[in-house]
Amino acid sequence: MTKELLRALPKIDEILGIFNEDFLNENGRETVVSALRDIINENRKAILNEEVDYALTKEEAKSKCEHRLLKKRERNLKRVINGTGVVIHTNLGRSLLSKEATEAVALAASSYSNLEYDLEKGERGSRYSLIEGIIKDITGAEAALVVNNNAAAIMLVLNSLCENKEVIVSRGELVEIGGSFRIPEVMNFSRAKLVEVGTTNRTHLYDYEDAITEETGAFLKVHSSNFKIVGFTKSVSANEICNLAREKDIPVIEDIGSGVLIDLSKYGLEKEPTVIESLEDGVDVVTFSGDKMLGGAQAGIIVGKKKFIDKIKRNQLTRALRVDKFTLAALEITLKHYLNEKEAIEKIPTLHMMTLDLKEIKERANRLYKNLERLNKFYKFSIEEGESTVGGGSMPDSKLSTYLLRIDSDSINEVNLERELREYKIPIITRVYKGAVYIDLRTILEDDYEVIFNALKEIGEK
């Protein structure tokens, strides 16, 4: 039986003979041959292992080859629809860029630019000068530097200012910032020496003072943006640490994480420390992310006293961690939105989604509900109240009131419907609970409505 099946396997030349010549030219004959060899070899191996009891026909091998090459040509990084209600969704790319920032990236990608060219002097310039001015204007810092992410920013600052020196940190601030990336490990890699003070839930100013030695290089304060310690707690403010640091002539470094530039508590969100407040407290060097609460591209932004920033700029690691022209283009425009707070709230998608009026979200839900009425033979739709989250390791206590579209079906259960939506040509990521699939309208964009309709229609008609 096995020998008969192996003999029945079609030859490569025979399969090639039934391909359209245009397909061979478009994909390349060698590529098609290679894919066919893999397909036939897989079938041969399965026959020998007695996993299958059939040999592929020429037509079946051709179909598999076409499908495989089509999949190979698809983008791995693709558009998805975020129906989860998590605004800064780490796994879905974090913050979206504004229309203007997106256009700036496209322009930088499609044309030459003055990335490192001083147009006034007609000579080589610095890429950092393109963005340092706007960061200084918005934050009030003496100087600024941008690297490729906030973990890199922390590591670079510590290596530049505290190599082989002790850095004093509260035990309650030894955070893990995601992907098992922990402050102690970052510090170790930077060659700074960690000195832990206080306890997980309670640290006093005298703990910092008692830990000072001749080897002390800095105090480090880390904002616990992705968790909260409640109950019997005590922490020391940046202002208190800065007062002590001035007495002892020791620099203070603060990682405030998410990069909040405006007080969002006035919009009903949880109060988070802003970059400006940190600098006003007297912190010498502040680091934060560009693609979280700030709403821009992935970057680590370092601001603070010029004497410290200048030293950081001279570190050889700075070149290894530098940002490209796309990041600079996106970040510059995003930051310019902040020159007018109203413009920032309206134009930066992250801020706009977080501050959306509940009435507007309900209108979105009603609109989607009406769009989907034609699919009532496949599904039952309803609108429910729910909660969104900020995401991105930011504001863990903030629950944002929202409206959800609930999808029920008699023909497909919620697990399979979620999978079908996730595997659609434009993946739709949803929530599943209470025996149904839910779409949170807070994170649905204008172009998403039609895709959601088409996806549900195609799934229903299967």
UniProtKB/Swiss-Prot annotation:
One record GO biological process: conversion of seryl-tRNAsec to selenocys-tRNAsec
Its biological purpose: Converts seryl-tRNA(Sec) to selenocysteinyl-tRNA(Sec) required for selenoprotein biosynthesis.
Database matches in InterPro entries: PyrdxlP-dep_Trfase, PyrdxlP-dep_Trfase_major, SelA-like, SelA_trans
Metabolic or biological pathway, per its Swiss-Prot or TrEMBL entry: Aminoacyl-tRNA biosynthesis; selenocysteinyl-tRNA(Sec) biosynthesis; selenocysteinyl-tRNA(Sec) from L-seryl-tRNA(Sec) (bacterial route): step 1/1
EC number: 2.9.1.1
Record's protein name: L-seryl-tRNA(Sec) selenium transferase
Modified residues (N6-(pyridoxal phosphate)lysine): 292
Catalytic activity: L-seryl-tRNA(Sec) + selenophosphate + H(+) = L-selenocysteinyl-tRNA(Sec) + phosphate
Annotated localization: Cytoplasm
NCBIfam families, per the entry: selA (TIGR00474)
Cofactors demanded by this protein: pyridoxal 5'-phosphate
Keyword field: Cytoplasm, Protein biosynthesis, Pyridoxal phosphate, Selenium, Transferase
Domain of life of the organism encoding this protein: Bacteria
Cellular component GO terms held in the UniProt record: cytoplasm
Coiled-coil segments: none
Protein family: Belongs to the SelA family.
GO molecular function: L-seryl-tRNA(Sec) selenium transferase activity
